[in-house]
């Protein structure tokens, strides 16, 4: 599964894209009506990030979401990597 955050586990979710027509009620119209609905995927905001791992004196490359990057800033790289390894992921 390529579009999965290695830290938080965020992955694509499914949803719909709605086609609407009409004039909104606050513009004195009859309201917006749904005329169609198409399936779509909501992609997580992922990117590859190269992070210096000082405890092992090397860089590690992780596929992260923005929420995971904030988690790493808050907890530190060592705590996050320790939790990942406890869950069986290789880093």
From Swiss-Prot:
InterPro entries associated with the record: Ribosomal_bL28, Ribosomal_bL28/bL31-like_sf, Ribosomal_bL28_bact-type, Ribosomal_bL28_sf
Pfam families the UniProt entry points to: Ribosomal_L28
Biological process, per Gene Ontology: translation
Molecular function GO terms recorded: structural constituent of ribosome
GO CC aspect terms: ribonucleoprotein complex; ribosome
PANTHER family linked to this entry: 39S RIBOSOMAL PROTEIN L28, MITOCHONDRIAL, LARGE RIBOSOMAL SUBUNIT PROTEIN BL28M
Name this protein carries in UniProt: Large ribosomal subunit protein bL28
Organism, scientific name: Protochlamydia amoebophila (strain UWE25)
Source lineage: Bacteria, Pseudomonadati, Chlamydiota, Chlamydiia, Parachlamydiales
